[in-house]
């Protein structure tokens, strides 16, 4: 069965003049028992909607008075009636002059006047008193005598008359009259039916075969024996009688009514014009029982006849398919072909039509994936539910979620069951970044890249300043380098590119990156300090990268310098000096006096010649990111080292998950350049984001290709993060249980460059202990912004700024949010300060420190003050801010604080041993002579992080 929505039912009610809002209609349906209706979009079955429509219509609209038939076997004809005025009949009307009454008013209705029976045969007519309309049925029910019937032949009869002989028609009068209806056939006597009071204005019809006598025309003789009747008003032939529907009982033959029909031209011009039906048209109505909740009603069956379908004709099977159950029931009750009374007729719907499933072509049922694909993406491509795929994977023994990544083999098994084929589609980066064969004829000599490494404060930057004849070290915070610096220096031996790496232990990653991109490593060791931990780390990084090491023993100008001891220590790490028969060049130098610097440059040039450092400047540029940062007004800035080709302004490049077009380039002196050859460092502007230091960069044909490569790398990185969820093991659960009570310090790290941000984050994470952990919520490059403050406020974190400052008004916002901002310029200061913050999370240890004792000698009760214990200090000192224990018979009976301390009459802070004083104890008034007062103080001890 079809359904109907609630808002459609509201529109149907609105057409009947009942306006209800959606909420009111839903509440009304709930009151009628349709609790499944939730909103105006809910649906109801057709029979339910029809029943609800009928009920609401019955409640909101007044029911019209039902037209009930007076009895079977008669025709009801509705006319416009007028009520003639009451006229008193004269005693002896003259036969020659007929009387004419004045025309009655149209508003007055005709009321029959019941007449009383006269005892004499020919009495004089007496005027009957005027009675109301309600008295007419009572008078009609009285049994009239034969004399009364003769006197009043036109009186209305409530009971059907007995069949009688046909009465001859009256003589024709002068005025033309309408044709009279044919006489009805005799019928057997019917049982009497109770009469009902007729409505106001109702005029009863004459009995069959009898008509009331009409007044004779002027000059016609009156009929003998007929009673005098009130004269009827003249009828204007130009006035049409009102047309109305006539009800016809099907068991009786129809009585045609002749009416004036409009001319043919008018009917052709307006064939279906709205308004009353054409005059002369006969409508056939049938009285049928009403539907649920309704009374009997008249049904127009003439339309069925015109269509050639008779009432009671069985409904065909095709028609029955388009009808609801209630519609079929109503058609069966009325014994006729069903015609909808209200609403539009529904178009029959085709039942049994199967949904046609459009299958994809074979070439479209191939799924091309790379290394993996998520369950949700696979379900969307195949058009199946993700839950079905997850259920199948669970049957295969794989517990996955909708966003989990599955490999190509597993996806092929799932796709095969649904008629799909999986093909691995590898993203070939070589298509966008092709490898060019080395052309020996195009190779040119490039400058060597030299990385200066060593321990902190061993003079690396000072040595570079001496080579560059600059003073970079004086401008560094704390005199230490905290990010990689790239410089190109012109020497008598040719251009050399130097990379200055930090020596602090936190910058291990920077040193490793420096070792990867360099050709030579200059290991700086202080002659007075010797080999240190970061020196050893630098040696390991250089050996791992396979780079030649030159050792510069610095600070030989100091009195405590011992170059031989340094050379001896380096032999432990397989670095043997040439003077001792080894292969490692070791030179004593001094950055202050510039001793040994020319010899160092000569050895660097010699090593570069041995290595034969050459590159092709005509190919697309490629290299490595040395450092990256985010500057206000300039955006992401990357310091790159060009290893191959020539980098030009306008080139499209890609590095990691970022891409862009080179907008500008600047060298280490801040000068803008248009192109940079191999072996030179440069700052690049125009990337989409801050790249990761150490990533490679490549120049591609256009920015579109760069974007595709970057998006591919970002997708692989996201898949790796989603697929890198480690399953919980028993060891992990035990480790989590051990650290369940551990305090955690949340941090938001912002630094000036990407390398520093990485180094600071790693250093702070290493500061975590078993008692307090460190969690980095966010680590980024740039100034501290409002977003960082909101992130810290949400995570209850501390913001750590390294060589960066907050933007304007950010400190006020942080103060309002209760966020602490710590700014540092030196990394070890940041680590020490964060350790203090970590210790502040631990609960302090409360330790009791004894101060002294006093013996109660006498007790004083002072009004409005309380009890005062006159005591003598026997040990130590008694302080007013201390705590006190009252001991009696070696038992502590009270513990509290000292409320007052006086010496004689003066308030004092403390009383030393051997003096007497008055002590008041807060909250205790039962001090007795001989009690001992032990005075002590509580001090908080910060616990250790270890």
Swiss-Prot record:
Region of interest (G2), ranges:
479-483
Database matches in SUPFAM superfamilies = Initiation factor IF2/eIF5b, domain 3, P-loop containing nucleoside triphosphate hydrolases, Translation proteins
User: Which residue windows does the record flag with biased composition (Pro residues)?
Assistant: 186-211
Annotated GTP binding lies at 454-461, 500-504, 554-557
Q: Region G1: start and end of each range?
A: 454-461
Sequence segments annotated as region (G4): 554-557
G3: annotated span: 500-503
The answer to keyword Nucleotide-binding applying to this record is: yes
Q: Where is the composition biased (Low complexity)?
A: 102-165, 174-185, 212-229
**All residue ranges annotated as the tr-type G domain in the record:** 445-614
State the InterPro entries in the record. Answer: EF-G-like_DII (IPR053905), IF2_II (IPR044145), IF2_N (IPR006847), P-loop_NTPase (IPR027417), Small_GTP-bd (IPR005225), T_Tr_GTP-bd_dom (IPR000795), TF_IF2_bacterial-like (IPR000178), TIF_IF2 (IPR015760)
What's a Pfam family in this record? EF-G_D2
Q: Disordered: where is this region?
A: 58-250, 301-324
Q: Where in the cell is it found?
A: Cytoplasm
Sorted alphabetically, the keyword list is: Cytoplasm, GTP-binding, Initiation factor, Nucleotide-binding, Protein biosynthesis
Q: Any idea what job this protein has?
A: One of the essential components for the initiation of protein synthesis. Protects formylmethionyl-tRNA from spontaneous hydrolysis and promotes its binding to the 30S ribosomal subunits. Also involved in the hydrolysis of GTP during the formation of the 70S ribosomal complex.
Family according to the record:
Belongs to the TRAFAC class translation factor GTPase superfamily. Classic translation factor GTPase family. IF-2 subfamily.
Q: What PANTHER family does the entry give?
A: TR-TYPE G DOMAIN-CONTAINING PROTEIN (PTHR43381:SF5), TRANSLATION INITIATION FACTOR IF-2-RELATED (PTHR43381)
Indicate what this protein is called per its UniProt record.
Translation initiation factor IF-2
Show the taxonomic lineage: Bacteria, Pseudomonadati, Myxococcota, Myxococcia, Myxococcales
The gene name on file is: infB
